[in-house]
Amino acid sequence: GMGIFSTGPSFKDAKIAMDVGLNSLSVILEASKYGTFKSIPEKEIFRMEYWPLELAKVKISSQKLKGQVAVITGGLGGIGYATAKKFQKEGADVVLIDIIDPKKINLDLKGMKYIKCDITKENNVRKVFDEISTIYGGVDILISNAGFATVESLEKLSKQQFDKSFDLNLFAHHYFVKHGVEIMKNQQTRGV
C-alpha cells in the first residue's frame, strides 16, 4: 500500500500539503498507464521552483500565531468569541469549547472547530483534549474563559447554586488546565 504523511506550520497548511501530495500521486499513477514516470533533474526542479515569478506567489506571513492551536472554553460567549476571532486573525487554529448550541446563536464560526462539552465533568474535558490531539496533533494555547455569575445574596444562595458555581468557576478551570498542560508537557513545548 501507499500513504502520505503531511506537515505544515498550521493544520490548514498540512491539509493543503496533503491535497497536493495526493493529487501528485494520482497524476503519477494515471501517467504510469502510458509509460514510466521520470522526474526532471534536480537542477531543473530548483530552477523552476526558485524562478522569480514562482517566488512572487509565496507570501510571508506576518501572523504571530500561525501554526498554533488555541483552545478556548466559553468560546461562544462574548469574551471567548472575541478572543477566538482575534486569535484566528493572527493565524491560530481555534477550537471553541462550549455547552451552548451554536445553532441557537448567530456567530460566524467559519474556520474554527466547535466542540460541545460540559467542562464541569473531568472525563468530558479529557475526551475533548483527546479529540483535539487527534485532529491537530496537540495544543499550544489554553484560554480558560468559561464561567458565570450567580446573582443572589449569600444568605439566599442554595447549596445547588453554590455547587454549580464552584463546578464551573473553579473545578472546570482545574480540569481544563490539568489536561491541557499534560498535552503540552508531552509535546515538550512551553505553551501559552
Language-model features: locations:
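Conserved glycine-rich cofactor-binding loop
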Residues: 76-77
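Conserved glycine-rich Rossmann-like NAD(P)H-binding loop of the short-chain dehydrogenase/reductase
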Residues: 92-105
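Active-site loop of short-chain dehydrogenase/reductase
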Residues: 138-139, 184-192
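A short, exposed helix-loop element centered on a Lys and neighboring polar residues
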Residues: 177-178
